[in-house]
């Protein structure tokens, strides 16, 4: 199985046809929908299924201009890092020796190293957080997680916040490893995201099985 084959199969399902009809209709009536159509599946394009080593679960795309480009927590170059990403950078400074805060928020290099940067919902209306919740994306992304759960090789799942932890309930196979904790948003970062050490823990787990660590510096 590959991501393109997975997506093609989902496209045959009634829920998906309703979902895409809804998203296309929203675009057609003139609503601004993020990310742009060509970026909706960026996470799957950038990190092929057979290369996934780590999964990072976000919620829905950023809903401001030029932010979302299909990778959770990531923003296009030239756009200020949103608060959650800024807090991730702060934790990286404390957790990874020598890490310095980048002057951008584009996490594509993480995705290219095998981190699937997966939002639970893949589209959103401009300025309306969670506006496409319950339209069908949750089914799509749960099916993607079930496929990841079925992979024989071990995968590390990083679940920040109650939303991601609930979403990760489908990860049941014993070969996988789960790191969970509070979300990096300003509302919860001080409840245990700061100091969680998840970035170095990911690398410890990868190196323990003979794999290259993630180069977090971007």
Curated annotation (Swiss-Prot):
Which terms in the GO cellular component ontology are assigned?
A: cytoplasm
- Top enzyme category: hydrolase
Annotated active site residues, numbered on this chain, are 60 (proton acceptor)
- A GO BP annotation: base-excision repair, AP site formation via deaminated base removal
Name the Pfam families on file: UDG
Q: Which GO terms describe its molecular function?
A: uracil DNA N-glycosylase activity
Q: Which residues cross the membrane?
A: none
Alphabetical keyword list: Cytoplasm, DNA damage, DNA repair, Hydrolase
UniProt protein name: Uracil-DNA glycosylase
Q: Which organism is it from?
A: Shewanella oneidensis (strain ATCC 700550 / JCM 31522 / CIP 106686 / LMG 19005 / NCIMB 14063 / MR-1)
